[in-house]
Structure formats: structure tokens, C-alpha cells
Amino acid sequence: RLGRYAKPFGLYKLRSMSRKYSGQNAIQIFTRMNRPDLVEEYRKHRKVRKDPRITAFGKFLRLTSLDELPQLINVLKGDMSLVGPRPILPDELEFYRGRGSLLHSVKPGMTGLWQVSGRNDLPFEKRVELELYYAQNWSFWLDVKILLKTIPAVFRKGSAH
């Protein structure tokens, strides 16, 4: 993942996806599965609601957001903050249309404006918009507001997948 100043770092996370799909291109996997519906959903959201690559235990981890807890190690190491834009993969940088330097002007966070504004129910373009808004308008009080909204967002049914 890319951190502040686009510096790559290792993101700690509990494995929720079957190992056989690790590091493979999602669109190619869904195409091989003959699932054009998943290809379309992935192109729109960069995620899929009922992802067949996720294990049964992984579904539980994602629904409860427990897969994200190891990122506290990233926070303690200084790679991440509690609040900020989600750390992106290098191939996602193209979606920020030349505004990657703005995105990477702040540390990535465990939670952020995207998570408390609808999370996976929003198209990826909206995520980009929210992440850039945060980077441009960061303030202590915005972080407090996001932190206060995070707990109900985690428990909101269906927002994590």
C-alpha cells in the first residue's frame, strides 16, 4: 500500500481471502469464473458485495471489521494514523486523476470520511472524492467528528463486505 508521500509500506491485516487468490487481478479471476456481474461490480466499486474469494471466517472478520485491527501496529509504527484516507494500492492511483500528491499529503488512516459516509455502498469515484476532500480540509475537529461516527458505522449492517 502507499502511505504518506506515496511511500510504500506493509499493511497489517487479518487474511480474509482464500490464499489461492492472493496477489491475483480480481477482474481476471471473475472473468475466469464466468461472472460478468462481478466484473462490472468490481469496476464500479473496486470491491464486490458477495465476493466468492472470501472465506467463511473472512466474511465474519470483514463484517465485524476485525480484519482491520492489526493496522493498529501500522499506527504505532507511524505508517498510518487513526483517521485519514484509506491506504491505496499503487494501481488505484490512476483513479485520483493527477491528485495523488494531495491524497498522499496526509497519512492514511484506519478510519476516514469514506468509512463513515457509506463505505462499500458508495461507488469508488465517491470514495476518491471523499478521500481528497479529507486531505484538502483536514482539521483536528474533522478527525474528532469522524472518530465519533466510526463506531456506529462499524456496527451498521451491510456497510462492510
Give, region by region, the residue ranges found by the protein language model:
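Conserved small/aromatic sequence motifs within transmembrane helices
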Residues: 1-161
